[in-house]
Design a protein with these regions (language model features):
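Catalytic cores of the polymerase beta-like nucleotidyltransferase superfamily
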Residues: 1-467
Length: 467
């Protein structure tokens, strides 16, 4: 793999003609030729792409730019799966992309990229980039968004954070990526797959391998270790021995990684439908406790909650961030609730609320959780203790069901029923009571997730991701 990292003569200016030569499969800046699979040699078909992704690829191509589908979508399509989202790389510069798509916005701080908005889907379009530097965090993005808006308002804007040499060639863009299987390009010009890093072979053999020296790549960005284990669990792949050994050597660095990005990876894991397997892999490799020091997750009940989340996601349910993160705290909270309940079943609310706050505070701070998320977890968990007995009166149900935190509380209630804190009879009586007061949507959601149905074509959530 090292040879693939050999330096290239970097040319920050990528002309359109270079793009077209690249599109024809001839590397212009490399001593090493990429491997190219022509259209009949692979099974990725245009009809597997979303209409929006096709639209963006073609508009770039017809405007004279090179345009590739890149990253996870190419990997997933070659494996016969459905991608979560479609990312595009091009030689067009952010302002040029912006001009081509009215429904777009420039984002990113040091490295600017463009989000093209469609109904329910965002296509991310990035100019080929040279630098392998760690992805940015949402905090950077927020500032950058303001800057970008100001720049657009000025004819010749000063761009203090943008350094031209962040842009690179397609080969450099492939090599700055994390794993070989994530660096394949699908070329809209001739429908070929371009592989600069040995990704096709690794995809065929089921191997997760860093691009370049694994120690260097993990030091550069420790979150990649979490990602390697996550992909292995999700795809049922093996981690290449050198990559695995480097994880073992470098895992201590994870506790210094950017917390918003770690929280983002956790939420991605929880929404993948394979949280149980990913968590197990993280736990076994000794990275979970380093990444999420303040999350209690050490009991069978916690694993049961993860299994329920997986079952829900596979059935097409959407969980909110507070219900996913709060799920980690539920088993320990239930122990606290037991401890604060006397033999007559009365709960010492003041003490329980205090202990709940003490339990959540460290994680709230170390994981950069928003006040709103913490509030919903706090209220939602506490509400479960109020639902331990069957509801007595309709207005009690309605009052609770009208609270903003109730959808989160209901998720926790269902988890609590699965781990035996709520009896099946009480569970059923709350379901009936909710239907009676016209709040059946929550219980219907559950019924739906009980039936296995094919996973819908998942569109990207319109929210920013740290990169
Ligand atoms: P998923 O199915 O989880 O979305 P993905 O491969 O699309 O998987 P993303 O997090 O969406 O993962 O990132 C898109 C692409 O960006 C990756 O495929 C990879 O090429 C590149 N990438 C993401 N994170 C990193 C990183 N930390 N270091 C280097 N490259 C990265
Ligand atoms: Mg993706």
């Amino acid at each position: 793999m090292d040879e693939h990292r050999s330096a290239t003569t970097h040319s920050p200016e990528i002309s359109d003609s270079e793009g077209m030569i690249e599109a024809m499969g001839t590397p212009v800046d490399e001593g090493l030729a990429p491997r190219i699979l022509t259209r009949p040699e692979h099974k990725l078909s245009r009809k597997d792409l979303s209409q929006e992704a096709i639209k963006v690829l073609y508009r770039l191509h017809r405007s004279g730019y090179s345009a590739y589908l890149v990253g996870g979508s190419v990997r997933d399509l070659l494996l016969g799966g459905r991608p979560k989202d479609f990312d595009i790389a091009t030689n067009a510069r952010p302002q040029e992309i912006r001009r081509l798509f009215r429904n777009s916005r420039v984002i990113g701080r040091r490295f600017r990229l463009v989000h093209v908005f469609f109904k329910g889907e965002i296509i991310e379009v990035a100019t080929f980039r040279a630098s392998p530097e760690p992805p940015e965090t949402p905090d950077d993005w927020e500032e950058a968004e303001e800057e970008a808006a100001e720049e657009e308002a000025v004819a010749d804007p000063p761009r203090p954070h943008i350094v031209e040499d962040v842009y690179g060639t397609p080969a450099e863009d492939a090599r700055r990526r994390d794993f070989t299987i994530n660096a394949l390009f699908y070329n809209i010009a001739d429908f070929s797959i371009i592989d600069h890093v040995g990704g096709i072979e690794d995809l065929e053999r089921g191997i997760i391998r860093t691009i370049g020296d694994p120690d260097e790549r993990f030091v550069e960005d420790p979150v990649r270790m979490m990602r390697a284990l996550e992909y292995a669990a999700r795809l049922g792949f093996e981690i290449d021995p050198q990559t695995a050994e480097a994880i073992d050597r470098q895992k201590a660095l994870i506790s210094e990684a950017s917390t918003p990005r770690l929280t983002y990876e956790l939420l991605e894991c929880l929404r993948s439908g394979q949280a149980t397997a990913i968590h197990k892999a993280w736990w076994k490799a000794g990275v979970f406790t380093r990444a999420y020091q303040d999350l209690p997750l050490d009991t069978d009940e916690s694993v049961r909650v993860l299994e329920m989340v997986d079952a829900g996601v596979v059935a097409g349910r959407k969980f909110s961030d507070p219900s996913l993160i709060g799920g980690f705290f539920l088993p320990r909270f239930l122990v606290l609730a037991e401890e604060e309940t006397d033999e007559k079943g009365r709960v010492n609310n003041v003490r329980l609320l205090d202990r709940l706050r003490e339990m959540l505070e460290p994680a709230a701070a170390s994981m950069h959780l928003s006040n709103q998320t913490v509030h919903l977890i706090h209220q939602g968990l506490f509400a479960v203790t109020k639902m331990r007995c069957a509801p007595e009166r309709g207005h009690q149900v309605l009052k609770l069901a009208r609270q903003g935190y109730f959808p989160v509380a209901w998720e926790f209630f269902v988890f609590a029923a699965a781990v035996g804190y709520i009896t099946p009879e009480v569970h059923q009586s709350w379901k009936r009571a909710l239907r009676k007061v016209g709040k059946q949507e929550l219980t219907d959601q559950q019924r739906e997730s009980a039936q296995e149905r094919p996973r819908p074509h998942r569109r990207r959530r319109p929210r920013r991701r740290p990169r």
